[in-house]
Each structure stands twice: as structure tokens, then as C-alpha cells.
From Swiss-Prot:
Entry's localization field: Cytoplasm; Nucleus
Keyword Membrane attributed: no
Keywords noted in UniProt: Cytoplasm, Nucleus, Proteasome
Residues annotated as domain Pru: 17-130
Name of this chain's protein: Proteasomal ubiquitin receptor ADRM1
Subunit field text: Component of the 19S proteasome regulatory particle complex. The 26S proteasome consists of a 20S core particle (CP) and two 19S regulatory subunits (RP).
Main location: cytoplasm
């Protein structure tokens, strides 16, 4: 499976990490079978970590072997951590994802119960309101703020001078969450930043981290517990906690518009912005719920489509560029998560100026400005049909000329 290479932060050792965890506590895993959760008796540790790329990781590791079995990249409002009150035989907690039915259960192994609520509160706090880069014991500024892009040689010049490859890099695996963050622009917004040469004095951005969340399958191997560890809870019925909406606090900072803006700066800025839950107009369409494996299967069976998609597969000695790999990549949880983020960003109505940089037709850009995903899809489909028709007509003309 190529998902690790498609999203480099999921590859072990590909990102540096801070030596100090934001929060950690001893807890075991629980496996969900049908409607019942069963405790895994191994000694474990749950911890939240912010890596050097500013992403927030929710992790579980085996304290005996030191093996990290679960490493989830979480962005704000993606999930909630809460106690399962229905379980009376132990201190059971669930990490409930708001999109879909994914749930991960854990049982507390801390000998004392006095800090259970504090651990739970901190987990939700760091998952839904991640600290800004440099906020934890660092003296650095967190990089350029968006307001600096409004000055001379700012965002409009930067985007206008980007090559297609650079733009793809901006919204690619490491910047895709940044693309979604465009929808959270406040103040003048992206459109006015592109059209205005006047610098602003401050900018507001949400302290969010974005990337697709992935779950590493856990092992079922058990190891002997020490006698000092709390007793594992009895098997309990699985419950579905109601999700609670968390708000993200903004952070403002004055910046100098005279600082040169690099592609990496813009990418980092976009990566710290939150994706809005819904667009301003109409009902939001989630592309991940539309482009399902069942719908994509006949399309991906087309040899011409496979040939066009092949160059975009992750490259590497151990990553075969095959039709099967296309199927694996497009149906991976990481890709589906990224697709949902793009849907939210497109529905925000802030992507029109960026879409125009790709040379998309005016109808598609207009739809992106309005946050109308359905109109955007229709415009792209119309353009594709026109190009196919023109290509076919050109081919027929060439054949007629060769016959003459």
C-alpha cells in the first residue's frame, strides 16, 4: 500500500518530533467486536505529540515492547475523546471520529483516578486547539503571517509566478490541508489579497493542523501485566457518544509586509488554518461520499484513465506504479480524508482565485468563488467534454487530410 509514501508524515522517521509529549497517560487498548468491546491486557501508553511539521498525533504504544501501534494524525473537530459512562466495570474511554463510524476504545491503567478527567480534557484541548508552532517553550515566531502577503511582491505575484508543479506542491500531500485552510481566511480574504496591493497590519489564523487521519492496525498479541496495574474492565457494550463541537481560538500577530514570501512560507501559513465545517451557501457536498470505491471502480478500469493517473502515483523502489496501486491509493483512508478537506475548502467560496491559477474555465472559477461544488463539477465536466470533442474533430481532420 502506498499511503505512507503519499502522506510522508505517516512514514516512521520521516518527520522529526518533539521529545516532550503534550499529554500522556497509561492506558490499554480495547478491541471492538460487534457491539462489545474487549480489553487488551497489555500495558500501554496513550500520548499526544506535536511533530516538527506542526501536525498533531494521537498515539498508543505498547509499554513493554515500546512499539507504537497506533499513530493518528488529527486535525481540529475531527474527533472527540470522552468517557464511556455506560461501562461500570472499568474506566473506559472512546476516541470517536465525527465523520463516519470509526471508534477507538481505551481503558485507564493509571493506578489513581483523580486525574482521569484532566487527561480527558487535555486530550480534547490539544486535538481541537493545537498549540501554535513555537508556543511550547520556543522563542521563534511561527513564520510569516498571511498579512505579509498583501505587500509588494506578495501573494498575487507569488501565485502568478508559480509553475504548475509548484502549485501542485502547494496543494499536494504536504500542503493539501493548507488548501482547505483557505476557507478560513478572515478580514479581506484571499480574493481581496490577490486583487489588492495594499499591505495589512495583522492577520488572524486558526491554530489547526491538517492531514488525513490514518489508523495503524493493531496487533492482537498479549503480554503479561504486572500486579500493580489496574484490573482490565470486563467486556462492555459499545456505545456511540454524541459528538461535541469544539471551537478553535484564533491567534493574531502583527507582521512586516516587507519580508520576502517563499513558497514554503505560504504553504506553512495555509497549513495552520482551519477548514470550515460548511460553506456559506447551500448544502455542502462531500466529494468523499460521492467518489466511493463502487462508483470509481468502472472508471478506474478504463485503460486510458489508468494511463493518465499513473504519473501521479508515489514513486519509489518499493512502490509499483500499477493499476492496482491506483485503486489502493484512491480508496485509502488518507485519500478519502484529503478529499473531504478539499470539499470543505471548495465549499467555503475562497478558492476561485487559486483555481484561476490553474487555467480553469471561467464557469469553474465562478463556481469556486460561490462555493458551489455541484456547479464546479458540471463546469469541469463540460470543459472536459468540449476538449474531447475538439480532440476527436482534430483527429478526424488529420485523417481526412492524410487520405487526400
Amino acid at each position: 500500500m502506498s499511503s505512507g509514501a503519499l502522506f510522508p508524515s505517516l512514514v516512521p522517521g520521516s518527520r522529526g518530533s518533539s521529545s516532550k509529549y503534550l499529554v500522556e497517560f497509561r492506558a490499554g487498548k480495547m478491541s471492538l467486536k460487534g457491539s462489545t468491546v474487549t480489553p487488551d491486557k497489555r500495558k500501554g501508553l496513550v500520548y499526544i505529540q506535536q511533530t516538527d511539521d506542526s501536525l498533531i498525533h494521537f498515539c498508543w504504544k505498547d509499554r513493554t515492547s515500546g512499539s507504537v501501534e497506533d499513530d493518528l494524525i488529527i486535525f481540529p473537530d475531527d474527533c472527540e475523546f470522552k468517557r464511556v459512562s455506560q461501562c461500570t466495570t472499568g474506566r473506559v474511554y472512546v476516541l470517536k471520529f465525527k465523520a463516519g463510524s470509526k471508534r477507538l476504545f481505551f481503558w485507564m491503567q493509571e493506578p489513581k483516578t483523580d486525574k482521569d478527567e484532566e487527561y480527558c480534557r487535555k486530550v480534547n484541548e490539544y486535538l481541537n486547539n493545537p498549540p501554535m508552532p513555537g508556543a511550547l517553550g520556543g522563542s521563534g515566531s511561527g513564520g510569516h503571517e498571511l498579512s505579509a502577503l498583501g505587500g509588494e511582491g506578495g501573494l498575487q505575484s507569488l501565485l502568478g509566478n508559480m509553475s504548475h508543479n509548484q502549485l501542485m506542491q502547494l496543494i499536494g500531500p504536504t500542503g493539501l490541508g493548507g488548501l482547505g485552510g483557505l476557507g478560513a481566511l478572515t478580514g479581506p480574504g484571499l480574493a481581496s489579497l490577490l486583487g489588492s496591493g495594499g499591505p495589512t497590519t495583522s492577520s488572524s489564523s486558526s491554530s489547526s493542523r491538517s492531514q488525513s487521519a490514518a489508523v495503524t492496525p493493531s496487533s492482537t498479541t498479549s503480554s503479561t501485566r504486572t500486579t500493580s496495574a489496574p484490573a482490565a474492565p470486563a467486556a462492555a457494550p459499545a456505545t456511540t457518544p454524541s459528538p461535541a463541537v469544539s471551537s478553535n481560538d484564533g491567534a493574531s500577530a502583527a507582521t512586516s509586509p516587507t519580508q520576502p514570501i517563499q513558497l514554503s512560507d505560504l504553504q506553512n501559513i495555509l497549513a495552520t488554518m482551519n477548514v470550515p465545517a460548511t460553506g456559506e451557501g447551500g448544502q455542502q457536498v462531500d466529494l468523499a461520499s460521492v467518489l466511493t470505491p463502487e462508483i470509481m471502480a468502472p472508471i478506474l478500469a478504463n485503460a486510458e484513465v489508468q494511463e493518465r493517473l499513473m504519473p501521479y502515483l508515489p514513486s519509489g523502489e518499493s512502490l509499483p506504479q500499477t493499476a492496482d496501486e491506483i485503486q489502493n491509493t484512491l480508496t485509502s483512508p488518507q485519500f478519502q480524508q484529503a478529499l473531504s478537506m478539499f470539499s470543505a475548502a471548495l465549499a467555503s467560496g475562497q478558492l476561485g482565485p487559486l483555481m484561476s491559477q490553474f487555467g480553469l474555465p471561467a464557469d469553474a472559477v465562478d463556481a469556486a468563488n460561490k462555493g458551489d461544488i455541484e456547479a464546479f463539477a458540471k463546469a469541469m465536466q463540460t470543459t472536459s467534454s468540449q476538449k474531447e470533442r475538439e480532440s476527436s474533430e482534430k483527429k478526424e481532420e488529420e485523417e481526412d487530410m492524410s487520405l487526400d
